[in-house]
Amino acid sequence: MEYRELGDTGVRVPEIGLGTWKYKGGPEPLRKGIELGATLIDTAEMYKTEDAVGAAIKGRRDKVFLATKVLGSNLRRDAVLRAAEKSLRLLDDNVIDLYQIHWSNRSVPIAETMSAMEELVDRGMVRY
């Protein structure tokens, strides 16, 4: 597996990740992917697969770089915080490695969203 640095974080992630959009396979195929080196797992609030990902990474969390996303309809400050808390509950974890905006929402100032994202980092709920 080839790795690349995630921006200027010093963190190296696999070039190939396991995407979970429309994923229906349960934890075992994801676990096999992790065994084979595909340790970047991408999920999202919208995919409704965070619980399956959580089951797959249980006991393997130290091997996985976990990325998930917040819906564009949840970009107000309080909604971002609630969405991240829900994702963590579904993932059965205490930190998201990379929390991303799934798509923008022109009705919400980006400064409001980014302030909430920074708060998640400050609280230790999100790394990047």
Please annotate each region the language model reported.
Residues K24, E28, K48, F65, ...:
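Residues at secondary-structure transition points
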Residues E35, L75-Y128:
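Glycine/proline-rich, positively charged
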Residues I57, V70, M117-L120:
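Hydrophobic positions in alpha-helices of CheY-like receiver
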Residues F65-A67, D97:
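A structural signal for isolated positions on well-ordered beta-strands in alpha/beta enzyme cores
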Residues K63-F65, R127-Y128:
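Proline-centered loop/turn at the N-terminus of a beta-strand
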Residues W21-Y23, A44-M46, K69-S73, I101-S104:
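Active-site beta-loop-alpha junctions enriched in small/polar residues
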Residues M1-V64, D122:
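N-terminal binding-site loop/beta-alpha segment at the start of enzyme catalytic domains
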Residues R61, V70, M125:
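P-loop/Walker A phosphate-binding loop and immediately adjacent motor/lid segment at beta-alpha junctions
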